Regions:
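The catalytic Tyr-centered alpha-helix of NAD(P)H-dependent dehydrogenases
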Residues: 106, 117-124, 163-171, 202-206
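A short acidic, helix-capping loop that chelates divalent metal ions and anchors anionic groups
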Residues: 59-63, 154-160, 195-197
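Pocket-edge positions in alpha/beta enzyme catalytic cores
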Residues: 30, 42, 69, 162-166, ...
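Alpha-helical substrate-binding/gating segment
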Residues: 151-154, 172-194, 201-224
Length: 224
């Protein structure tokens, strides 16, 4: 919205919050797996490009309920791509994950490193990437897939931030301790190749990630 784009948001609000929706954006409550919903949205609005965030994303949950991840993530991508082809929309930016790589062979991970997901979440995202590749070859859709880990942070004025119930993300859990909402934080692992044996993690700030998606939209617009 701040870049001057006309934004249309589609969310079933299972984990989303209307309070985070910019009032200048047009909002539809709907599910990506509902073809009739996508057809109505694509008919009522002049859509130039799609930015796809609609996925389940908890690694642990994906191990106990992989069906949920293949249904929402993979089937959702199928319904979306079919709707895009029907309506002549040929650009998509996809929120993927570094979990597509599995256990990295080297640090930092390079884009062309081998992809060997170790959980259904990462596997579902890799399948979604491959779906875009083949639809691109068959129907001319241009796509960008962004693989990242550990998005964190909040907007600078604090009006929008992480909001999960129950909370599962590390940084919000840590902040609950000084706020008196949690007695302590537990750090798991003691055999990593680090000075104290605990795990190292890297993070990307959500505002940087938002900028990356805006830049990624321009890539297929320029013919990439």
């Amino acid at each position: 919205v701040e870049k001057g784009e006309d934004v249309v948001i589609v969310d079933n609000l299972q984990t989303g919050d209307m309070g985070a929706v910019n009032p200048k954006a047009k909002f539809y409550k709907g599910d990506i797996r509902e073809a009739e919903v996508l057809d109505r949205i694509f008919t009522e609005n002049k859509i130039d490009a799609v930015v796809h965030f609609a996925s389940n994303s908890l690694v642990g949950e994906s191990m106990t309920n992989p069906r949920k991840y293949f249904n929402n993530n993979v089937y959702g991508m199928q319904v979306l791509l079919e709707a895009m082809v029907r309506h002549g929309i040929d650009k998509i930016v996809f929120s993927s994950t570094a979990a597509t790589y599995g256990e990295p062979e080297r640090i930092p991970i390079m884009e062309d490193d081998r992809t060997e997901p170790t959980n259904p979440y990462g596997q579902s995202k890799l399948i979604m990437e491959k779906m875009m590749k083949w639809v691109s070859l068959a129907n001319g859709i241009r796509y960008v897939s962004l693989r990242y880990f550990n998005a964190a942070g909040a907007i600078e004025d604090g009006s929008i931030g992480e909001d999960h119930s129950p909370e599962t993300h590390l940084i919000p859990l840590i902040l609950q301790v000084p706020l008196g909402k949690r007695d302590h934080i537990t750090v798991f692992g003691e055999d990593y190749p680090t000075p104290d044996g605990t795990c190292l993690r890297d993070y990307i700030h959500v505002l940087d990630l938002a900028d990356a998606h805006v830049l990624a939209i321009d890539y297929p617009r320029r013919g990439g």
